[in-house]
Design a protein with these regions (language model features):
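Beta-lactam-recognizing serine transpeptidase/beta-lactamase-like catalytic domain environment
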Residues: 1-167, 174, 205-208
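Short, charged, low-complexity patches
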Residues: 55, 174-186
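Short, gly/Ser/Thr-rich active-site loops of penicillin-recognizing serine hydrolases
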Residues: 84-92, 181-208
């Protein structure tokens, strides 16, 4: 977080991950000093700015055991005359998350519990035969009467191959708004890869 992912698009933003020096420089005119209470706020995401792609990249790194890889929009390069594949984007390792293996395992277990645990907030993201893990979020919104709804998830938990970040502005709670959207994306991915049968029933998600 706080760094560009390196995706092959111009204009990507870094987001904002605050530390004491950055905080005091940003609020120099108001003389708002760094305080311990700000650390508690940061632990729940208060005062930070992230892009949906950073959210997906982060949860993907947790899922695959600490590796952050550069995302690409490009799937393959085709020869226009023959239609044959002549190139593929490289899977470049950007960095490794600086966490111990047991810490990563604890986070993975927590992600699993959010979707599959009895008190989890993302039951809407469950899929038959596919174990999904994730985290919901409902971020305070100073520009509307509803929170921003967030969900970050990976699947399948035993060997993750897809990571998703969903952000719905001024939409409500992450568990009731963002998680069902993520479930549709997960389902479609596993339908396309042959792990799930196509869902013939159409369900609509209404965002107030």
């Amino acid at each position: 977080l706080g760094n560009r992912t390196g995706i092959d698009l111009p204009g990507e933003k870094r987001g904002y991950l605050v530390d004491s020096a950055a905080h005091e420089n940003r609020h120099k005119r108001l003389k708002w000093k760094w305080a311990r209470g700000l650390i508690l706020n940061l632990s729940i995401g208060q005062g930070e700015l992230v892009t949906p792609l950073q959210v997906a990249s982060m949860v993907g790194g947790v899922g695959n055991g600490r590796e952050l890889r550069r995302p690409h929009l490009l799937k393959e390069i085709l020869d226009p005359r023959t239609g044959k594949v002549v190139g593929l984007p490289e899977s470049t390792l950007v960095r490794k998350l600086p966490f111990q293996a047991d810490h990563i395992a604890a986070i993975q277990q927590a992600l699993d519990s959010v979707v599959n645990g009895t008190q989890g907030t993302a039951h809407a993201c469950r899929l038959p035969g596919i174990r999904v893990g994730g985290k919901t979020g409902s971020a305070e919104n100073p520009h509307g009467d509803k929170t921003h709804a967030l969900f970050a998830g990976i699947a399948p938990m035993e060997s993750p191959e897809i990571a998703i970040g969903v952000v719905m502005e001024n939409a409500g709670h992450g568990g009731s708004i963002a998680a069902p959207i993520a479930a549709k994306i997960f389902r479609r991915y596993f339908e396309l890869t042959g792990r799930l049968k196509p869902d013939t029933t159409r369900k609509e998600i209404h965002v107030p």
